[in-house]
């Protein structure tokens, strides 16, 4: 198409506020306070108009809610690529709280005949919302008045495609309807060996008017992974069901319906590919598959190392140990995949679930220990593509499902839920979500990584929101007493606040950082160690929790070094080696007769590596060598295995993502130090 640039014009004075965009293929305008996505729309002057696009429509029980697009704004505007976001709500006066809100984003590239559409729904009511369906409609090419310009039905070609290894097509002649539905049972019975975060298959529908020489193909992004989904096409157009009719779906599926708890959100995407009438099935399928699994460039690990944007986790090839490298990759791959609209990107913890922490329900890890951050570090040091996709998929879930987007309790808003049932504790009684928020279970580094890798400003906003939530929690009485909480509580808080300070240079983060550091110093003076209450009459050392604090203090030290802080960190590491090591060279789980079993927590390896970094004394590395070897030689949980439908998810494999999230940085950080000392 030659050199084409995007042209964007904001509305003039005395006109309704809106944005007009041209990209060489499309010419459209979006307007505030509108009941439809487009105010005007043209694709090369034929077939499609503003009225060709209807929805989204949200069905709840017997009602259908219509959208109101309240405000459009430019997120990104350049000559090659542009992003427009519309925010709004579904119109219904019977909804509690602030109602059901949404955002819609339109991603447009210069000279390209497709629009990537993302739709994000927010349950800002006090209750659980169980949508009956969530649908978009794209009408078949017409005259702009709801009439097809084709004189004969034979001019309309419909096409439906779904793929596993190869795409299976079903073509409808004379405008006949074709389409399909993806359920848990469909996936349960279909063999697929792809890493699902990277790719599973595609799911598409097309309607083409041969007389007008124009058509449109719709592809739902990662439809299988985010079931239930449906798509159909007929002579009247394409129906895109981000949530298909759940009343009908429940007749053929035993999976529980999709239900949005109070404060929960979820984004789904689809591509609208406009084309001429001669576009082949191969070309439509090719674009659809590229949408599902686009080419992704990467930066060499050596560049990441030189840039010093990641921790010290890099080794030259001559120092790398093949067995260790293989083990780290296996551990990264060894997590369960949980298909489902509200589940993909997370997995339940088998241990928490078996303990009954979910009252019989699955206990979702909610990205405990910052699983995405571990994956982004693994991607940086290896360049393996799927590690990036693991991180991106987890962050997408995290930003929507694991963060509280609405609550009457200000201590919940923008915070991250601790591992719990139904992702946020559930809201059956209509009194908001009943999960727990604690500084020990709120992370931001993975969100900041995602922001740096993708440029999506929503991740930065989410990280800042979590940071503000942490500040609010630190002001509560629970966090004021010395030794009344575990070392990991304020330790994780310090880690998050340090990352935000490095990112934003906002002094509000540093003020609380200084307060936390002083709390640790006073804690040591009062008890002689970082003891914390465990039973009603006992205070003990918990090595892995103390290690969280050590790691966080070290992050702060790298930003704001001082001799006093260095001495405090070395003292804490020495306290671990003197009191938490078994006679056989491992670390105790917890310092209590009923819990002093051999530990396998790798967090203590990070503490040992920090001791070495600050002193140069290899004795600290020697304390950790048996724990390191035990961890590296352990078998990673299964990423593949039996499929089982539980609640609203299809679970494949058994490994909880928190295992890699917790262990990667300690293992890799210790590994780089020990390899340089020829201990490995």
Which residues does each PLM region occupy?
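Surface-exposed interaction regions enriched in Ser/Thr/Asp/Glu
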Residues: 1-7
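Well-ordered alpha-helical scaffold segments within catalytic/enzyme domains
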Residues: 86, 120-124, 271-273, 315, ...
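Solvent-exposed loop and edge beta-strand segments that line ligand/cofactor-binding
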Residues: 253-255, 259, 355-368, 423-440, ...
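Low-complexity, Ser/Thr/Pro/Gly-enriched N-terminal "stalk/linker" regions
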Residues: 288-361, 403-427, 664-680
